[in-house]
């Protein structure tokens, strides 16, 4: 006795395949030198590991400010490249409640890993702005 597999025809699946041939997906080549804004990307850059980034921020907390139990914020703008790395020359402190928080934020970002932004499924360079909050413990 042989067993033959049953194949069920699905009209919905057949229609989807037919539509794929009628309207093929177009993948647009991205300009590798272009920097996209968050509004232009379909997938926004994200931290590869929030826990790792939090450790980087905590480990880089300026000692003098930690001793004085001072908290604050550093808002930084930077470019995440297509491989998920922060471009070193792109990091700028937009605002910091203490200059030391701005410097610490820059150092943490340069060691952090990101999932890059994407356009049409392709990883692209993306400009990001991020507030980093330092809380005194």
Region locations from a protein language model:
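Charge-biased low-complexity segments
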Residues: 2-10, 23-137
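Bacterial N-terminal signal peptides
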Residues: 12-22
